[in-house]
Amino acid sequence: MDDLRFRRVHVAGAGGLLGTAVADELEAAGHELLHATAPVDAVVHCPAPEPPGRLTHRRLAAHRRGEEARARALAQDALVSNARLVHVGTAFAWGDHGSSWIDEGTPQRPAPLGAGDADVARHLLALRKERGLDVVFVALGLVYGPGGLFERALLDPRSRVVGWGGNYLSCVQVDDAARAVAAALQRGTAGTTYLAVDDEPMTQRAVADAAADAAGRPRPGTASLGLAGARVGFPLARSLAASQRVRNARAKAELGWAPRFPTVRDGVWTALPR
């Protein structure tokens, strides 16, 4: 076990799927988890899940405003306490790059679910330049695990592949995501972004089929972007239809992290209803 550089940690968003996993991972590693009002060595900002139900542009905008306000407040807290801030974002900030590979240096053209995160990252980097904020960024692939998007999709017989399904998705199992966040807290370089995804981007069709096969359910059909957007909301539909082949080389090399579930096929069972 590493000597803990940042022992006292506040995890913002610890009640969600990802935040719970991050809190569990840090506690198991020996960190002391504290409330926001206590003196801390580090703050981890886990994003709140998108609101349930149909995700309209208006609902997403309201959610994004809340997340941006929380990120700004946590950054101020970190500056006052001279604490490290780990901002957990999403690979959707890079958007659709077709069949080309994406790494941290790839230009961002955010998908709808990543637009707010790109704005927050710019603000936090400005605070680093102007006031010395010790901030590290972890951008996660599509996170799956118990109680998450995959489980909800499996329980909904109306779930469909958006479009023809040939776009790439880069995913990460929730416990692997939590381990990446913990590694970034301990070993990440300030001002640096780490993309944390599994080892094999799969097409949306392959991901959907792997989930259905693991659950013993029929493989889903397809729906046009228009039909999918009308049912689940266009921001979500457009994001799921974006093609993202994301590399994890920097996280492996600099953080010493590697996914225990290298593909969705290996880990999808963890998202099945129990």
Task: Enumerate the language-model features and the residues they cover.
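Conserved Rossmann-fold NAD(P)-dependent oxidoreductase catalytic core, especially the SDR/UDP-sugar
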Residues: 71-112
